């Protein structure tokens, strides 16, 4: 009987990528298959996030729930990976003694060895070391599950923003060699992937050796240019970028590489220079706005999303008003917005914070309502337009329909004959938008005569 692994992922796209790699590693080593049911699993893994306190506590809540499964099935192995694992280490086992494995983002490739050691010794295994880029040399080839794929190009962060725990849980920035990244993407393209999202905590800080051990370095712009030349790759996305690392070379790539989408996630975090300085972000609001103006001069249809922190220590009403002014001016399509959460060990955790919680919540609600108005307005502006989408698979709302994504990352659901589904999935097609909802669209196929004939037979 095939053994199964269940992985629950918290947090960012980097964690989503790492979770996929955990499954790949265990499949290659022990033949385990992924399951969506923890009750059916032989191994349960939690890939954790420590960016906010709520996400961290959720992990221990979920661990408490699977404890009963272990009591009923003693051979069940439970593991905690990701950033909470890096931060807490062996204290996780002290708090939850039924946990068998604790591993960091850089040691997930060692899971098979850790499992063997746990079975042999009967003791919990903890490995939260930072062996830099070693894990990529030990990962099996990716197993593709659709026409889009994440590709991690670097690990860690060296910015040390005052509020952020990531440099302490993922280490400093380390880039993969250029040829390693290109080899992985070419392999994905051979399996039908048409869109890649390049991942990094500060992805545009990429500085990778041309080959392992080489002295010549490729910057992020060079990497994008090479990826665009890989046969089969139609679209390139990336996340998350940092305004401080947005070079002229990268701006030039937007003019030269049409496969780089008209969508950018560029965290601003706040609209007040005073707060940005306290956050140690390394740029001013004016510098951020100047960068966006340059980008939109090159790409007038650029869709922009961001991250914003509300209620950072010392934030006044005037500071928050500046954030709102920036939101109105930038016309963000999406914002991942949260109330500031102090993280242990970060400089900001020691700052005085006298803003009442209810005031922070009111500000967050005001910000999110404004963003939602922007989202709805942008969706409405797409009505009647023909959009190029990558068909990803059956619609979640109706499996008889198909769904794809626009360049600005909107999901479009559209009807198509069941006989055409297999042919259309993974293809770039045109759809005319005929209904707009805040976070998704509805459209209809726009086909040439020959295509229309093929699609309906």
Swiss-Prot record:
Principal localisation: cytoplasm
Catalytic reaction equation(s): N(6)-dimethylallyladenosine(37) in tRNA + (sulfur carrier)-SH + AH2 + 2 S-adenosyl-L-methionine = 2-methylsulfanyl-N(6)-dimethylallyladenosine(37) in tRNA + (sulfur carrier)-H + 5'-deoxyadenosine + L-methionine + A + S-adenosyl-L-homocysteine + 2 H(+)
Domain TRAM span(s) in chain numbering: 380-447
Binding site for [4Fe-4S] cluster 1: 12, 49, 83
Location in or out of the cell: Cytoplasm
GO CC, alphabetical: cytosol
Enzyme Commission number(s) of this protein: 2.8.4.3
Residues binding [4Fe-4S] cluster 2: 157, 161, 164
GO MF term (any one): N6-isopentenyladenosine methylthiotransferase activity
Co-factor remark: Binds 2 [4Fe-4S] clusters. One cluster is coordinated with 3 cysteines and an exchangeable S-adenosyl-L-methionine.
Keywords: 4Fe-4S, Cytoplasm, Iron, Iron-sulfur, Metal-binding, S-adenosyl-L-methionine, Transferase, tRNA processing
Protein task: Catalyzes the methylthiolation of N6-(dimethylallyl)adenosine (i(6)A), leading to the formation of 2-methylthio-N6-(dimethylallyl)adenosine (ms(2)i(6)A) at position 37 in tRNAs that read codons beginning with uridine.
Family: Belongs to the methylthiotransferase family. MiaB subfamily.
Protein name: tRNA-2-methylthio-N(6)-dimethylallyladenosine synthase
Source species of the chain: Burkholderia thailandensis (strain ATCC 700388 / DSM 13276 / CCUG 48851 / CIP 106301 / E264)
């Amino acid at each position: 009987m095939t053994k199964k692994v269940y992985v629950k992922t918290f947090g960012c796209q980097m964690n989503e990528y790492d979770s996929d790699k955990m499954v790949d590693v265990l499949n290659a080593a022990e033949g385990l298959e992924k399951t969506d049911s923890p009750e059916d699993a032989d191994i349960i893994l939690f890939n954790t996030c420590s960016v906010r306190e709520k996400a961290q506590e959720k992990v221990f809540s979920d661990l408490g729930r699977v404890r009963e499964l272990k009591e009923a099935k003693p051979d069940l192995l439970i593991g905690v990976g990701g950033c909470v694992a890096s931060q807490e280490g062996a204290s996780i086992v002290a708090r939850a003694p039924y946990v068998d494995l604790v591993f960091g983002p850089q040691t997930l490739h060692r899971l098979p060895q850790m499992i063997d050691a746990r079975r042999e010794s009967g003791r919990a295994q903890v490995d939260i070391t930072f062996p830099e880029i070693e894990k990529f040399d030990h990962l099996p080839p990716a197993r593709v599950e659709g026409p889009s794929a994440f590709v991690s190009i670097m690990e860690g962060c060296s910015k040390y923003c005052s509020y952020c725990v990531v440099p302490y849980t993922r280490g400093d920035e380390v880039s993969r060699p250029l040829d390693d990244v290109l080899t992985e993407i070419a392999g994905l393209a051979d399996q039908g992937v048409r869109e890649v999202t390049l991942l990094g905590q500060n992805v545009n800080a990429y500085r990778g050796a041309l080959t392992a051990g080489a002295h010549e370095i490729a910057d992020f712009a060079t990497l994008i240019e090479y990826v665009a030349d890989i046969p089969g790759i139609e679209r390139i996305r990336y996340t998350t970028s940092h305004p401080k690392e947005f070079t002229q070379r990268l701006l030039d790539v937007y003019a030269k590489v049409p496969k780089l989408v008209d969508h950018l996630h560029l965290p601003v975090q706040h609209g007040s220079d005073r707060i940005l300085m306290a956050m140690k972000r390394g740029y001013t609001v004016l510098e951020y706005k100047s960068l966006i103006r340059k980008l939109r001069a090159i790409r007038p249809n650029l869709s922009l999303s961001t991250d914003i922190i509300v209620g950072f220590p010392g934030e006044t009403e005037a500071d928050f008003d500046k954030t709102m002014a920036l939101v109105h001016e930038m016309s963000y399509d999406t914002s991942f917005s949260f109330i500031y959460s102090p993280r242990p060990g970060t400089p900001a955790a020691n700052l005085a914070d006298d803003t009442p919680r209810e005031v922070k919540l009111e500000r967050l609600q005001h910000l999110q309502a404004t963003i939602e108005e922007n989202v709805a307005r942008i969706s409405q502006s797409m009505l009647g337009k023909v959009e190029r989408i990558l068909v990803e698979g059956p619609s979640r709302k109706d499996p008889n329909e198909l769904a794809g994504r626009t360049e600005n990352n909107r999901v479009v659901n559209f009807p198509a004959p069941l006989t055409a589904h297999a042919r259309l999935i993974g293809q770039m097609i045109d759809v005319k938008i005929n209904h707009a909802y805040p976070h998704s669209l509805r459209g209809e196929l726009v086909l040439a005569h020959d295509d229309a004939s093929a699609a309906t037979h």
